């Protein structure tokens, strides 16, 4: 799977936040989309039970098959299920064997290096024919955000972890920025096919596949079309064996037929919950919860926390919806993470007045009865009235005007709470006189 370590070797402007917010689809759905654009893929169908997997295998009428767990994570082949089964991609040779492996996958969590120890639930398997491959290639189209155009990333070392290839043999990675156009110039595809080393018999098919994959990327508002491997078979056909398609969430209004296929079970439940109420929330690995309005201010808040030795627990942009209901939901999401040791509220009041935000904040904090420190910085319209409201509330909300000072205090409080938890003691905070 194309992830951050590969992108570091590509232009710098790939934002992890933008990547994470894009719609990702299961392999079997991606294959269906590719088929509609005339791209050749192996025959196959999804199954949601062992019985269905057996039927699909029989209907394919071949003895060389593969059963693939459908989870949105890389490293499936080397993963392990909580059922004890090793490997989320298993070759099988008859329908009975397909059923056996499907039953050990469906309803179980697959743990890979990308899912972490929690794993991801497998609700569907993809049963498809297995092809005899002469050569495997890697091919992807994604957005070059620095140059504001599509970019091809390709390699003649496909079928393996592209991150490993990029780390061990960076010269094997081909990158090319493309002009913004509804169609790919076939000459660009021909040049790439020559560099990758397709056989002369398969070159026309490879060019055709690449041109059509670009059409998928453009027409579907995709942010990434990744094929690994793009395979040349022993009979010189060119097939997209495994496909990962990501789509721009901002284009949902144009592609409701695609976005309706989103599998919420594969997404972080807190992030999915936040999206439903219009909050832009992304979990991170730190322990200082952040509640901010505006993506730019949210990024700056995380930067200054890290500058002072802290680690943000989340990215949370409430946007222009910083009312009591949004703040309540935001606090609920932040405190749902047991790692959180402090909460930094950093709001700039423009159209929404600071005193209104302060009243909403006080209402939420009073109801939640939190035992972790809250550091608050409200700047903008009616900021003086907001500070007065907070100071008169009697709640332990630490209010600051200066961003740097507020960030330092958040980091210090966080360390105090962390040390108290390690020592298994309670700690309380009082406002200075």
Curated annotation (Swiss-Prot):
Q: Among the entry's GO cellular component annotations, what is one?
A: mitochondrion
Q: Does the keyword Nucleotide-binding apply?
A: yes
Query: Which GO-annotated molecular functions does the record name?
Result: ATP binding; magnesium ion binding; succinate-CoA ligase (ADP-forming) activity
Q: Which cofactor does it need?
A: Mg(2+)
Listed A to Z, the keywords are: ATP-binding, Ligase, Magnesium, Metal-binding, Mitochondrion, Nucleotide-binding, Transit peptide, Tricarboxylic acid cycle
Question: One matching Pfam family, short form?
Answer: ATP-grasp_2
In terms of one coarse class, where is the protein primarily found? mitochondrion
**Residues covered by the ATP-grasp domain:** 31-273
Q: What class of enzyme is it?
A: ligase
Q: At the top level of its lineage, which domain of life is listed?
A: Eukaryota
Q: Which InterPro entries match?
A: ATP-grasp_succ-CoA_synth-type (IPR013650), ATP_grasp_subdomain_1 (IPR013815), Succ-CoA_synthase_bsu_CS (IPR017866), SUCC_ACL_C (IPR005811), Succ_CoA_ligase-like_bsu (IPR005809), Succinyl-CoA_synth-like (IPR016102)
Entry binding sites for ATP: 68, 75-77, 136
Gene3D superfamilies found in the cross-reference section: ATP-grasp fold, A domain (3.30.1490.20), ATP-grasp fold, B domain (3.30.470.20), Succinyl-CoA synthetase domains (3.40.50.261)
Q: Which residues bind substrate?
A: 293, 350-352
Q: Name one GO biological process term.
A: succinyl-CoA metabolic process
Query: How does the cofactor attach, per the note?
Result: Binds 1 Mg(2+) ion per subunit.
Q: What EC number(s) does the entry state?
A: 6.2.1.5
Location in the cell: Mitochondrion
This molecule's function is given as: Succinyl-CoA synthetase functions in the citric acid cycle (TCA), coupling the hydrolysis of succinyl-CoA to the synthesis of ATP and thus represents the only step of substrate-level phosphorylation in the TCA. The beta subunit provides nucleotide specificity of the enzyme and binds the substrate succinate, while the binding sites for coenzyme A and phosphate are found in the alpha subunit.
Q: Which family does it belong to?
A: Belongs to the succinate/malate CoA ligase beta subunit family.
Q: Which PANTHER family match?
A: SUCCINATE--COA LIGASE [ADP-FORMING] SUBUNIT BETA, MITOCHONDRIAL, SUCCINYL-COA SYNTHETASE BETA CHAIN
Note the subunit structure: Heterodimer of an alpha and a beta subunit.
Q: Can you name this protein? A: Succinate--CoA ligase [ADP-forming] subunit beta, mitochondrial
| Organism for this UniProt entry | Schizosaccharomyces pombe (strain 972 / ATCC 24843)
């Amino acid at each position: 799977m194309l992830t951050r370590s590969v992108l570091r070797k590509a232009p710098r402007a790939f934002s992890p936040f933008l990547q994470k917010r894009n719609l990702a689809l299961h392999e079997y759905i991606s294959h269906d989309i590719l088929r509609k654009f005339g791209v050749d893929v192996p025959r196959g169908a999804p199954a949601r039970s062992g019985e269905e997997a057996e039927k699909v295998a029989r209907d394919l009428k071949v003895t060389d098959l593969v059963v693939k767990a459908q989870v949105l994570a890389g490293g499936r082949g080397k993963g392990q299920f909580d059922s004890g089964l090793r490997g989320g991609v298993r070759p099988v040779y008859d329908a009975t064997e397909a059923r056996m492996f499907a039953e050990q996958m469906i309803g179980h969590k697959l743990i890979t290096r990308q899912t972490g120890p929690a794993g991801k639930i497998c609700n569907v398997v993809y049963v498809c024919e297995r092809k005899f491959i002469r050569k495997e290639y890697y091919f992807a189209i994604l957005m070059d955000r620095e140059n504001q155009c599509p970019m091809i990333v390709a390699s003649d070392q496909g079928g393996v972890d592209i991150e490993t290839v990029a780390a061990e043999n960076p010269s094997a990675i081909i990158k090319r920025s493309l002009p913004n156009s509804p169609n790919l110039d076939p000459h660009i595809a021909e040049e790439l096919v020559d560099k990758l080393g397709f056989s002369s018999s398969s070159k026309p098919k490879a060019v055709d596949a690449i041109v059509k994959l670009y059409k998928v990327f453009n027409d579907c508002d995709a942010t990434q079309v990744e094929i690994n491997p793009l395979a040349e078979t022993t009979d010189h056909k060119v097939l997209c064996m495994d496909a990962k398609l990501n789509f721009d969430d901002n284009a949902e209004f144009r592609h409701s037929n695609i976005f309706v296929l989103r599998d919420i079970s594969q997404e972080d439940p807190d992030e999915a919950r936040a999206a439903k109420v219009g909050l832009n929330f992304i979990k991170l690995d730190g322990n200082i919860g952040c509640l901010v309005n505006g993506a730019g201010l949210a990024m700056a808040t995380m930067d200054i926390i890290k500058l002072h030795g802290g680690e943000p627990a989340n990215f949370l942009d409430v946007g222009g919806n910083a009312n009591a209901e949004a703040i309540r939901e935001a606090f609920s999401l932040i405190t749902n993470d047991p790692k959180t040791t402090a909460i930094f509220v950093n709001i700039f009041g423009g159209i929404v007045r600071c005193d209104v935000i302060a009243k909403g904040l006080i209402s939420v904090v009073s109801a939640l009865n939190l035992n972790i420190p809250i550091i608050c910085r409200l700047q903008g319209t009616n900021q003086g009235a907001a500070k007065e409201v907070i100071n008169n509330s009697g709640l332990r909300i630490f209010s600051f005007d200066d961003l740097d000072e507020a960030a330092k205090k958040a980091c210090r409080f966080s360390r105090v709470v962390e040390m108290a938890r390690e020592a298994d003691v309670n700690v309380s905070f009082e406002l200075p006189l």
